[in-house]
């Protein structure tokens, strides 16, 4: 990951390997390229827009390989300042809140089990 200039355009560069690469490719056939990343994985899209915001770069370039690293697919996404600013406001609200936000899962939800705050939410 880093910053790259391609065809005179500056991009925040991310390189990912995913078992879901075929879904990404299929979405590229259904949606215009600027919308593909958000449709494919909203968490990756949020990450990309945050990187662009803090790097002050107007474009994001994802190079995604299949799990074996043999096939590559490229997706270019323009920076969405409105979306990135909304994420920052959400983070500020959570950080400044007197009470923690509602739990997104439960004690046995896999995302919760992987979270570094699991003990705060579920341990006595």
What is each of the regions a protein language model found here?
Residues 25-27, 35-45, 50-124:
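Metal-dependent nuclease catalytic regions and adjoining charged, substrate-binding loops involved
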């Amino acid at each position: 990951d880093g910053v790259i200039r391609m065809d005179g355009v500056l991009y925040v560069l991310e390189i990912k390997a995913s078992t879901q690469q075929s879904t990404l490719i299929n979405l590229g056939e259904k949606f215009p390229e600027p919308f593909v990343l958000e449709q494919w994985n909203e968490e990756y899209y949020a990450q990309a827009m945050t990187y662009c915001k803090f790097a002050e770069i107007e474009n994001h370039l994802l190079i995604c390989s299949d799990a074996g690293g043999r096939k590559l697919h490229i997706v270019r996404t323009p920076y969405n300042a409105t979306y990135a600013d909304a994420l920052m406001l959400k983070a500020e609200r959570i950080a400044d809140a007197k009470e923690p936000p509602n739990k997104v899962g439960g004690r046995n939800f896999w995302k919760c089990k992987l979270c570094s705050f699991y003990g705060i939410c579920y341990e006595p």
